[in-house]
């Protein structure tokens, strides 16, 4: 755990250098819908330490990933964020928080399953307690009673479970709309989605209800993420995101 934090600190310090260089370089330029990125990459101007970006993070599909990154930027700007901003404008704060709590409560289902698969009795018991308390006393999770009772919240997914059992990252991958990932985490995302979908089927939910929940979950998730594409002012934003995502996931698995 301490090693992971030291690595993150080291990478963050390197990223400060990246951003400083970016301030003196040509940042991505937006021309209408187009985003023109500099033709050079971070590993040409930084020292050997930042070769981690290309040497340790496998990115054989970089061309596709960068194209998808730009697609996500446009989708975010012209579709996702306008919807999110409209949602936040018409939804009272207390209701918005309640909806967020509701989806966090649903996530405890996959956290419970993955805690078992990771042989973690403490996380399993605590997550079970949170889910039972919030689902009953907390009115299906709209009120986070468990946190008021100091029951810790954990976040575990199948990608972390695969990592726990020694499965490597695989190549870096930028998913449509969802953003940075890798092959292992992409598979994990699919397994977690399938698990929740099976539960919805057991509850006899209609397809329209499933889609409504999925869309609402997406809006809620984006509303709670502060990141905005191409606002770093750095020409190395793609590399920056790739490094931070990979380091964070390593920490998630090791915690």
Task: Show where each model-derived region lies.
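Long intrinsically disordered, low-complexity regulatory segments
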Residues: 1, 21-25
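Bacterial N-terminal signal peptides that target proteins for export
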Residues: 2-13
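Bacterial N-terminal signal peptides
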Residues: 11-22
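N-terminal targeting leaders of membrane proteins
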Residues: 24-104, 108-119, 209-255
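Short low-complexity stretches enriched in small and charged residues
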Residues: 62, 128-132, 195-199
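Mid-length scaffold segments of soluble, non-membrane domains
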Residues: 101-180
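Surface-exposed interaction patches
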Residues: 145-148, 161, 166-254
């Amino acid at each position: 755990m301490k090693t992971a934090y030291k690595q993150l600190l080291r990478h963050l310090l390197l990223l400060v250098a990246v951003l400083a260089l970016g301030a003196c370089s040509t940042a991505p330029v937006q021309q209408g819908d187009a985003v023109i990125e500099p033709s050079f990459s971070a590993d040409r101007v930084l020292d050997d330490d930042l070769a981690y970006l290309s040497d340790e993070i496998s990115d054989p599909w970089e061309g596709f990933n960068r194209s998808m990154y730009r697609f996500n930027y446009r989708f975010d700007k012209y579709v996702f964020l306008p919807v999110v901003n409209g949602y936040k404008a018409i939804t009272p704060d207390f209701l918005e928080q309640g909806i967020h709590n509701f989806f966090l409560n649903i996530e405890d289902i996959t956290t419970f399953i993955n805690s078992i698969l990771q042989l973690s009795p403490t996380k399993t018991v605590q997550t079970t307690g949170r889910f039972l308390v919030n689902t009953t006393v907390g009115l299906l999770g709209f009120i986070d009673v468990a946190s008021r009772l100091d029951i810790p919240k954990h976040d575990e997914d199948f990608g972390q479970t695969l990592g726990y059992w020694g499965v490597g990252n695989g190549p870096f991958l930028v998913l449509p709309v969802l953003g940075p990932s890798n092959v292992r985490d992409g598979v994990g995302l699919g397994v977690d989605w399938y698990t929740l979908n099976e539960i919805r089927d057991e509850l006899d939910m209609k397809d329209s209800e499933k889609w409504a929940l999925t869309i609402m979950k997406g809006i809620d998730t984006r509303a709670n993420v502060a990141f905005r594409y191409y606002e770093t002012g750095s020409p190395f934003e793609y590399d920056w995101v790739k490094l931070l995502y990979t380091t964070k996931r390593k920490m998630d698995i090791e915690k």
